[in-house]
């Protein structure tokens, strides 16, 4: 029976999925901006770089949001408290900022390559690639377990995490999954 509690739980899940999607979009845009800034740093003349970028933000300065938060704190505190906060802000500003050159972000909560979850995910992607149409969850679970030799304790949770990691995996109907689009390989995506 579909009651109010179930409806609220379903809405929370939908909100979580929408939030993850928006966060992913922001991360992609932020990565593009950082890449463009690094490219401009490499291609621009040293005098232009100093004028445009370095004078505004030092390499070891706080990220923009942290700087704004520190300014907010300063504006709300009386003068006597500002003196005690100043040493704390200096220690915070010594932390590295932004994404270091040549590195990619790794999503939190992802399993290490070679782990049980990674093997199951790889088997799931291979199985979904073999099927052109939607496949029942129970059939998919049997094929994944047969291919990987590992047991999936909770198929719903496993597939939800797979969908978050690979947006190409879709759930067209209740209890059915399909792979729409291309995924190079599960191994290269985990690196």
From Swiss-Prot:
Where along the chain is composition biased (Low complexity)? 75-96
What does the record note about the induction of this protein? Expression is constant during late log phase and for at least 2 hours in stationary phase (at protein level). Probably repressed by AbrB and SinR, as well as partially by ComK. Probably negatively regulates its own expression. There are 1000-3000 proteins/chromosome in exponential phase grown in minimal medium.
Keyword list, A-Z: Coiled coil, Cytoplasm, DNA-binding, Repressor, Transcription, Transcription regulation
Subcellular localization, per the record? Cytoplasm, Nucleoid
Region (Disordered) residue spans: 75-116
Ranges for region DNA-binding: 95-191
What are the transmembrane regions? none
- Primary location class: cytoplasm
InterPro entries registered for this protein in UniProt: WH_Rok
Coiled-coil spans are 2-43
Reported phenotype of the disruption mutant: Increased expression of comK, increases transformation about 5-fold, decreases sporulation efficiency about 5-fold. Increased excision of mobile element ICEBs1.
What does UniProt give as GO cellular component?
A: cytoplasm; nucleoid
GO MF terms listed in the record are:
DNA binding
Domain comment quoted from the record: The C-terminus (residues 95-191) binds DNA.
What does the function comment of this entry state? Answer: Repressor of comK, the master regulator of competence development. Overexpression seems to be lethal. Represses at least 20 genes that specify membrane-localized and secreted proteins, including some that encode products with antibiotic activity. Binds to many AT-rich sites in the chromosome, many of which are known or thought to derive from horizontal gene transfer; helps keep mobile element ICEBs1 quiescent in the genome. Binds to its own promoter and is thus probably autoregulatory.
Name recorded for this polypeptide: Repressor Rok
Naturally occurring in which organism (per UniProt): Bacillus subtilis (strain 168)
Q: Which gene encodes it?
A: rok
